Amino acid sequence: MESTLGLEIIEVVEQAAIASAKWMGMGEKDTADQVAVEAMRERMNQIHMRGRIVIGEGERDDAPMLYIGEEVGICTREDAKAYCNPDELIEIDIAVDPCEGTNLVANGQPGSMAVLAISEKGGLFHAPDYYMKKLAAPPAAKGKVDIRKSATENIKILSECLNRSPEELVIIVMDRPRHKDLIKEIRATGARVRLISDGDVSAAICAAFAGTNIHALMGIGAAPEGVISAAAMRCLGGHFQGQLIYDPADVNTPESADWNREENIKRLKSMGVEDPDKVYEAEELASGETVLFAACGITPGTLMEGVRLFHGGARTQSLVISSQSMTARFVDTIHMWDNPQNIQL
């Protein structure tokens, strides 16, 4: 899979990032997202594969493109037999977020990127559109920290694993009212908190790389993005756990005010989630034999530069990670269109 699709998926996220970057700082988050969706879908449909969106822009009735269940790739066309040999057909599941951090793009803030994860059919967890409690940490802490433990306990373990004092640790938390007590607890240990408005996939990945000065991600975010984060962390050997959140009291958002705890439990069970309280490991959320993850910076971030547009072209920086070869490749690309001038270095 890596040898046949590795370069292709880089180009998919590059095209989505470039399209979205053209709307950076324009205050139009929906447009920045929509153009990324269109560009990602168009490039996917040029790939020799039979792909199925398992995490995308929403249910079919709510999303015209890259909706859950949509099939993409040349081998999904009606005339597929003319292009695809059934014996060589690659059937894959795909999780996408064409513009992770739409508000970041709209406001010209750092940390947004186009991301996707792929695996063979059945290799990615079909996360319901709920919230998820998440814990991401470096490979050195894998299997030692635990989402069921308190933040205080996990920071103590993390400190020991990384041979750092708590004061030398930085924990990423989404800047949400629901995290008020979590932030207070983290700070009480001496660890420092970096608040982010959006983009917890990027934050989770940063925790796996030494030198980012990010040592863990804690708190509650969207479940679909949790699967994408898990795919990346599985490839990197980092620690990731997720637990679905169904109680409105844990989320504390305007939309959760209409939630009913018992109804949410029933809905999750109807979707195949036998134990709504189950803690999922990265290897369960991304269970495929082969998992590939790709991301391209839209605005500048800790790991990657954002898209840099110049007359007649653009320069992008991407990351592709593979569980097959256990590699993380940073790809710096100059895209030259019509009569490029002043090529960006």
Curated annotation (Swiss-Prot):
EC number: 3.1.3.11, 3.1.3.37
Origin organism lineage: Bacteria, Bacillati, Cyanobacteriota, Cyanophyceae, Oscillatoriophycideae
InterPro entries: FBPase_class-2/SBPase (IPR004464)
Stated role: Catalyzes the hydrolysis of fructose 1,6-bisphosphate (Fru 1,6-P2) and sedoheptulose 1,7-bisphosphate (Sed 1,7-P2) to fructose 6-phosphate and sedoheptulose 7-phosphate, respectively.
GO molecular function: fructose 1,6-bisphosphate 1-phosphatase activity; metal ion binding; sedoheptulose-bisphosphatase activity
Keywords, ordered alphabetically: Calvin cycle, Carbohydrate metabolism, Hydrolase, Manganese, Metal-binding
Reaction it catalyzes: beta-D-fructose 1,6-bisphosphate + H2O = beta-D-fructose 6-phosphate + phosphate; D-sedoheptulose 1,7-bisphosphate + H2O = D-sedoheptulose 7-phosphate + phosphate
Lineage: superkingdom: Bacteria
UniProt binding sites for Mn(2+) 2: 97, 100, 225
Single GO biological process annotation from the record: gluconeogenesis
Positions bound to Mn(2+) 1: 33, 57
Keyword Metal-binding: yes
Cofactor: Mn(2+)
Protein name as catalogued: D-fructose 1,6-bisphosphatase class 2/sedoheptulose 1,7-bisphosphatase
SUPFAM superfamilies: Carbohydrate phosphatase
Gene Ontology CC: cytosol
Name of one Pfam family that matches: FBPase_glpX
Subunit: Homotetramer.
Family: Belongs to the FBPase class 2 family.
Binding-site positions, substrate: 100-102, 131, 176-178, 198-200
Pathway: Carbohydrate biosynthesis; Calvin cycle
